[in-house]
Amino acid sequence: MTADDDIFYHENWLRNMWETYKKNPNTIIASRARLIKFNSKYSVKKYEHWKLIDEFKSPSYLNFPTGAGGTLYFPNSLSDMVFDENLFKELCPSADDVWFWAMGVLNNTKITCINEPLKHLTYINIGREVGVTSSITLWSFNKQGGNNKQIMNIFNYFNPEIFDIINESREII
């Protein structure tokens, strides 16, 4: 289970994750996710074009958990490469959600969302919430193109394997 420590979570958050997992065993469960979009069979669109998922989706490799909402990873759901710290730091050092998603896909583990996915995040730092903090945050770094670079690093490094897994599931049209 992963969750950010700077987010307020509602009281039933963990219970919702667990109940969804019981109905979808052998599936990674996200309380917040985006739907990955592609330009073509081997070309992924930029992160800002991936829409937030606002309702339960069938398990899919294209459901991309956003770590801030919390994600339940069942035992052995991720590739053993997840522990390759050097590769993680090389490909996506500030985007662990990108790394964890790839490690799930490479282990042939699909992802789904809770019935009512989180649409809005409430941060503990109210200055960040209203946009008045001057500090550079991981979120602001990734929003300024950091996510796209790290996503492309993953797709380029694990090409064609990661595309083949997704394409074999016939999810990309």
What label would you give each PLM region?
Residues 4, 68, 90-91:
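Short, flexible active-site loop motifs that bind/organize anionic cofactors or intermediates
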Residues 1, 24-26, 91:
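Generic secretory/membrane-interface signal
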Residues 8-86:
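Conserved catalytic core of nucleotide-sugar-dependent glycosyltransferases
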Residues 4, 32-33, 115:
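Glycine-rich, histidine-containing beta strand-loop boundary motifs that form or position
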Residues 1-8:
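Short beta-strand-to-loop acidic/aromatic patch adjacent to the donor-nucleotide binding site
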